[in-house]
Amino acid sequence: MSLSKKLTLDKVDLKGKRVIMRVDFNVPMKNKEITNNQRIKAALPSINYCLDNGAKSVVLMSHLGRPDGVPMPDKYSLEPVAAELKSLLGKDVLFLKDCVGPEVEQACANPPNGSIILLENLRFHVEEEGKGKDASGNKIKAEPAKMEAFQASLSKLGDVYVNDAFGTAHRAHSSMVGVNLPQKACGFLMKKELTYFAKALDSPERPFLAILGGAKVADKIQLINNMLDKVNEMIIGGGMGFTFLKVLNNMEIGTSLFDEEGAKIVKDLMAKAEKNGVKITLPVDFVTADKFDENAKTGQATLASGIPAGWMGLDCGPKSSKKYVEVVTWAKQIVWNGPVGVFEWEEFARGTKELMNNVVEATKRGCITIIGGGDTATCCAKWNTEDKVSHVSTGGGASLELLEGKVLPGVSTLNNV
């Protein structure tokens, strides 16, 4: 799947056209109030571009939460997003109480020029995901004929399809792959994601470093495997590190995370690294805790001493951080997926925070730094480094699947140029 060869919004003639745009407005809410509008703001450049370039209308569609195909307007309505959009754009936004059907089709057929229309939550229909739950909570599958009708109805709402929802690009949902229009382009947010990942995966700057953290080796086997074909160096930290250290060094790890499934493949991964000439850096010292708790008693341990019974490693120690700095300083391109400690708790955040500072410094001297979504993106938000690295991905699952070498359905369906 070539990421850099997709039709982009700026290459489409929009004059007089109705644009139907898949966005990611899956924003956090409390009592129907939006607590973080970042995802809405991220879609504004694409929306404004359409309006500035003569589009007749922009119809926006998104999911919110997991209603599983059951309409839950009290809990998961996108109506509060319409109000937020209106204040951000300074323009009226028409909110429709459904996303398909005759009334919606009529409202979108010939709207006044320059209209902005927001549809209700796509996931109120089981046909969006293809599966869901009935009113009693039993799992159900969508009927193929109804899915076709759902997709056909969405397709009537625009003349041009634009996808700007990278966060959902790994899902083959109706709004991602089922809108059947001649022109299917990526919006500016999607374009930025694809540009950075194409650079990382197809033509990386070297030396290329991957920093991989997180808990389970089994969850990251495909990621490690694929990246071993791409990188020059790899740091493996976080909870995953303990599985590697126990298998390779027979280290005592106390009650630290150990992944039985992942342990079986550690030696194969190391053999592949050696064959490909990839240098792997593992932690050598640890901040320990007597229980998995923010206020646990803390201690120190090293690779040589091991972690005592009843204790667990929740962060890397200063010697590991020093090793990581050396590797980061050498790199010309970095992809980082997964924290190297329990960064949510102050006592165990130092390792990840120090690594973040080093990645920021690397960016200043011209290194291309790409932060995979999910927890690592949360770290950037927590320490205000989002604009101090080259790119923070908006899609945790989508960026992970790209780095694993998978094809993203929401991208492959877009027109090639």
From Swiss-Prot:
UniProt-recorded Gene Ontology molecular function terms: ADP binding; ATP binding; metal ion binding; phosphoglycerate kinase activity; protein serine kinase activity
> Which keywords does the record carry?
Acetylation, ATP-binding, Cytoplasm, Glycolysis, Hydroxylation, Kinase, Magnesium, Metal-binding, Mitochondrion, Nucleotide-binding, Phosphoprotein, Transferase
Q: Which residues bind ATP?
A: 215, 220, 239, 313, 344, 375-376
Pathway given in the UniProt record: Carbohydrate degradation; glycolysis; pyruvate from D-glyceraldehyde 3-phosphate: step 2/5
Q: How is it modified after translation?
A: Phosphorylated at Ser-203 by MAPK1/ERK2 under hypoxic conditions, which promotes its mitochondrial targeting.
**Where in the sequence is N6-(2-hydroxyisobutyryl)lysine found?**
97, 216, 220, 323
Which Pfam families does the UniProt entry name for this protein?
PGK
Positions carrying Phosphoserine:
2, 4, 203
Residues annotated as binding AMP are: 215-216, 220, 239, 313, 344
Q: Which reaction does it catalyse?
A: (2R)-3-phosphoglycerate + ATP = (2R)-3-phospho-glyceroyl phosphate + ADP; L-seryl-[protein] + ATP = O-phospho-L-seryl-[protein] + ADP + H(+)
List where in the cell it is found: Cytoplasm, Cytosol; Mitochondrion matrix
Residues carrying N6-malonyllysine: 131
Top-rank taxon, per record:
Eukaryota
Q: Which residues carry this modification: N6-succinyllysine?
A: 6, 191
**Chain sites annotated for binding (2R)-3-phosphoglycerate:** 23-26, 38-39, 62-63, 65-66, 122-123, 170-171
* Enzyme class label: transferase
Positions of CDP binding: 214, 219, 238, 338, 340, 343
Q: Which residues carry this modification: N-acetylserine?
A: 2
Q: Which cysteines are joined by disulfide bonds?
A: none
Residue positions binding Mg(2+): 215, 218-219, 375
**The protein's required cofactors:** Mg(2+)
HAMAP family membership: Phosphoglyc_kinase (MF_00145)
Q: Give the quaternary structure.
A: Monomer. Interacts with kinase MAPK1/ERK2; the interaction is direct, occurs under hypoxic conditions, and promotes its interaction with PIN1. Interacts with peptidyl-prolyl cis-trans isomerase PIN1; the interaction is direct, occurs under hypoxic conditions, and targets the protein to the mitochondrion by promoting interactions with the TOM complex. Interacts with mitochondrial circRNA mcPGK1 (via its 2nd stem-loop); the interaction is direct and targets the protein to the mitochondrion by promoting interactions with the TOM complex.
Q: Which family does it belong to?
A: Belongs to the phosphoglycerate kinase family.
Its protein name is Phosphoglycerate kinase 1
**What is the primary gene name for this protein?**
PGK1
